């Protein structure tokens, strides 16, 4: 009985160790937390596929999608705000708190608001690459094209071998997959309003 009790005790310690290691590993993979959900928002990850709820955690490697007439607001880390409009789909490829990361934007509109004191974030899409530092910007469908508009700060946009720098108050368009970004230009007030309304 003494030996049996000792084996049970050791097995319990081993399981506890696994649980602690699992908890630490999961904490290392945390990308952010959900602040707002309107309509249907789903998350698909390594071990889950479900509707995403308020205050839930989103992990590195998760794919998050919004349905029709649906929107999402979440924080990446503590300071970077991410908003998705309807019919959007992103995958958080890599993210370290205050060190930046990579997001795949596969569909729909996205708004990113990132302080200057956090690391750079890359937004990859089928249309091109947007490199973000301390910036608030819109990325996604606008006036029938893929648009990038900088509310404040500056970004670089690379597509089809061409890179442009987009300054505050300017935007660039990519007409289709495989096309180059246009020379940055000021967007009209109505276009800006519609773009920002799609993610707020």
Model-identified regions with their sequence ranges:
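Flexible, surface-exposed loop/linker segments and immediately adjacent secondary-structure boundaries
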Residues: 23-63, 67-200
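N-terminal secretory signal peptides and thylakoid transit peptides that target proteins
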Residues: 1-21
